[in-house]
Amino acid sequence: MLIPSKLSRPVRLDHTVVRERLLAKLSGANNFRLALITSPAGYGKTTLISQWASGKSDLGWYSLDEGDNQTERFASYLIAAIQQATNGHCVTSEIMVQKRQYASLSSLFAQLFIELAEWHRPLYLVIDDYHLITNPVIHESMRFFLRHQPENLTLVVLSRNLPQLGIANLRVRDQLLEVGSQQLSFNHQEAKQFFDCRLSSPIEAAESSRLCDDVAGWATALQLIALSARQNNSPTHQSARRLSGINASHLSDYLVDEVLDSVDPATRQFLLKSSLLRSMNDALIVRVTGEDNGQMRLEEIERQGLFLQRMDDSGEWFSFHPLFGSFLRQRCQWELATELPEVHRSAAESWMAQGFPSEAIHHALAAGDANMLRDILLNHAWGLFNHSELTLLEESLRALPWESLLENPRLVLLQAWLMQSQHRYSEVNMLLARAEQEMKGEMDPTLHGEFNALRAQVAINDGDPEEAERLAMIALDELPLANFYSRIVATSVHGEVLHCKGDLSRSLALMQQTEQMARRHDIWHYALWSMIQQSEILFAQGFLQAAWETQEKAFQLIHDQHLEQLPMHEFLLRIRAQLLWAWSRLDEAESSARHGVEVLSAFQPQQQLQCLALLVQCSLARGDLDNARNHLNRLENLLGNGQYHSDWVSNADKVRVIYWQMIGDKKSAANWLRQTPKPEFANNHFLQSQWRNIARVQILLGDFDPAEIVLEELNENARSLRLMSDLNRNLLLLNQLYWQAGRKNDAQRVLLEALQLANRTGFISHFVIEGEVMAQQLRQLIQLNTLPELDQHRAQRILREINQHHRHKFAHFDENFVERLLTHPEVPELIRTSPLTQREWQVLGLIYSGYSNEQIAGELAVAATTIKTHIRNLYQKLGVAHRQDAVQHAQQLLKMMGYGV
């Protein structure tokens, strides 16, 4: 819940001096990206900007305090201020910040700017007291904000110092409007106006000018002169003499003598106690100070000019001038040291009564009251956890003694979930084990079930499926149906374990159950996770169309619940890219992988490994080895600088091994094989993939017998577990083995099975990456004209893809080849006496590669009619009448020249 006063522009007071000369300068603020108002405390920054903002409707105001260094809190208030300025225009950004569904502040701002692109009126965002921000993450994010904000948005920043926002760059580009302390200082005319509206009897212009010069136009000093003169009924020049040459760092003594010592004891107590509140209203004042009418007392203090300012138009919320508030809090530490804990307790109780647990925790911590802090956490901690107030929760839990956590084991559970969210898996188990060991009395079965559900999640995350399954099953036995969150966790873990074991049908059913429960209770991240798992399972079973449809539902969930910036979005984009790649929709696959990289841009680079492997895979399918090598360089760098799940390593190794196969790099392949551990089993698609990598390297090295043993065992497991996509991949690799070993009949047998299975999986690119060897076999099958219609159609499609992306296949008919061919002793006499032109040789090569007339015309960039002429000429010279005859003739020439076709 947001405190309204932090989003309210200060009310313009009746007795303030209108700074006409500065307002004139600020009138052109909409022409700048940043308006920066800097000066020490007390120069009137906030008052000036509140005057300038008066009458502007498309303006949001955000008043900072020390607590805004938490990135989640900063994001919440900043988006709320924008919503205030735009009358709720940025709905998606608001939902994302409320649900903490963004990867970083910068990515949240990127979404904000997408929505603001449809906002065409001038827009202003004021951030007051920016000097309180010390978090470098926020500074960096605000630099991003300034670089990318829409042209019609002006950011107005008020600060006591130059903020770390890339000011120099903005200044050079003339995108910065600056107002500093020299300009903020009152001139003689403004000082005269100030005294005229503050003092009962006017003073001479010469005297007001002298007073102004004595304090160098410092607004706070002028206010103190007027206040002292009123309270002590003394001449203004006496106060001026005392203030002459003074600055903010030496102001404390003056404020004690001239302000605190000049008010009655009750007012002094009121000022000191209320200063502990960062913002205040009637209810808070009544509870903290004991006043009967807090609102009336606040208004009275305001009338006395004691540096109290209204924070909203309704006059409900107030705050002290920052300079005076800081002074009062310091005095409070000295004068009310023994009362402070009780005052903070009262403040915490009042904030709780008004529904602001975060503020209540702030005061409970300041009071050092562990019992109060415990009670607040017991009632509100899970709500704060679900809103990602993780830093505040960690600080709070650290402040509680261990005994208090043991007496309230749900707080132990909360601390453990905090550790789990930060991937501190070993600490989770240590904490829970210690708690169980030291807890007095028998643990409640439901709580024990919650402990075990969390332990199960930790175990599966840590790569221990056996332990994860054991704990998940115990948890499901212990947890009542009403304990939906932990039951969702345990069910999800059980489904994931079965996935790892290759029990795909049962895993799919459990993941569908998880999705239903998660949707029913709005636990959207588990709903998304379960749908991603369903898609992976369906893909492994060979049901790629069903996997696609599940992905579509998952993308819709992401859109509906604004989950675009969760890391799981990248997971979905990645498996979509894998599916698109399988279907040879390479441009879409690459786009999806790049989108995945963008989603992870705010995370460690190592997280991008899988998407990077997919980019390599797309380049390999296109035959673009240079681009593949560029991506591989980065991928191998990431591999050497991180620890990864075996599935991630397997996917990265897959593209490396295929690349080595394509360029014939046996040395790298052999080194990899020596260093790569062999998985113990092959009962899921993760392990099948790594064994396939091993077999591919063995084939490359000519070790056909061990490779055949591996692939036959993989096929046996794949058939048994119904891992149909893996079976399809295994058959293609076995085909390569048989072909290279000279076992052509076996090669054709497994290729026919792979083609038939591809009618279910839709695989195209898995055939394409095998290159010319695959193309030669497919040409032979097509020439035999014995394939079933669907298989024939797929074979032709695969051949077209190979021809399109592996253009070097027709390089046999280049000039050097033709020159050697014509001098070959066995060259047909017809070719020797009636040689083809270079262009006709190119056309023959493309015909052999399976190109249609239109494709040949496109490849050679000539008209289709020209190609027909070339074909007619070369048919005549070769003595053939049909296209198939030309293909066979080209094949004979290649065999004669020693090419295996």
UniProtKB/Swiss-Prot annotation:
Binding site for ATP: 39-46
Pfam families: GerE, TPR_MalT
GO molecular function: ATP binding; DNA binding; DNA-binding transcription factor activity
Notes on activation and inhibition: Activated by ATP and maltotriose, which are both required for DNA binding.
Keywords assigned: Activator, ATP-binding, Carbohydrate metabolism, DNA-binding, Nucleotide-binding, Transcription, Transcription regulation
Residues within the DNA-binding region(s): 853-872
Family matches, as InterPro entries: P-loop_NTPase, Sig_transdc_resp-reg_C-effctor, TPR-like_helical_dom_sf, TPR_MalT, Tscrpt_reg_HTH_MalT, Tscrpt_reg_LuxR_C, WH-like_DNA-bd_sf
Start and end residues of each HTH luxR-type domain: 829-894
GO biological process, one term: positive regulation of DNA-templated transcription
Subunit relationships: Monomer in solution. Oligomerizes to an active state in the presence of the positive effectors ATP and maltotriose.
Entries under HAMAP family matching the protein: HTH_type_MalT (MF_01247)
Task of the protein: Positively regulates the transcription of the maltose regulon whose gene products are responsible for uptake and catabolism of malto-oligosaccharides. Specifically binds to the promoter region of its target genes, recognizing a short DNA motif called the MalT box.
Family recorded in the similarity comment: Belongs to the MalT family.
This protein's name: HTH-type transcriptional regulator MalT
